Amino acid sequence: MIRSGDVLHNPVTGELIRFVTAAADTEGEYVVVDVVVEPNGSVAAAHLHPYQTETFEVLEGEVTFKVDGKKVVARAGETLVVEPGTAHKFWNSGSTDARFRCEIRPALQFERLIETMFSLAQEGKTNKKGMPNPLRLAVIANAHFDDVRLPFPPQWLQKLALAMGAPLGRALGCEASNSYGREDAPIELPAAA
């Protein structure tokens, strides 16, 4: 279980996340994270959240977003709101670390998803973009379909693919969640500068 103050690191995507306010502290109403992204670091893939609003406030550096196909560069002091169902991706387009605060509302299973993806990257179980093998991804995506989806193909096709891929992945031992080797909390990492 994620707690306020926990830190997760994805060495593949170059993201470091500190949970400022965990879902347990808000009864699932929202989660607040501070994110540090290394130069050329990025979220693993373009995605959308069908039921969640994300509010990004850039604190340091420069973050480039692609939101509904439009490129937006946000600098320190600027805020960007991504509404439910809106395809988006972000990356650090600057030459120094970028830092932003993000509120995810409602929390749903955001923490579990991030812990799963980051711990798989820590264990070397992702490709160079931070994505696990397709069968493992099908199991994870099926379990988190209310949290995150791809902007394409259409949702009905994603559901069809997951209906076939997820059972096969589970039969081969893939699980929908992964943790940092402890049942109750991720590893502790130093705070970002």
Question: What residues fall within each predicted segment?
Answer:
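Jelly-roll (double-stranded beta-helix
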Residues: M1-Y30, V36, G41-Q52, E62-A193
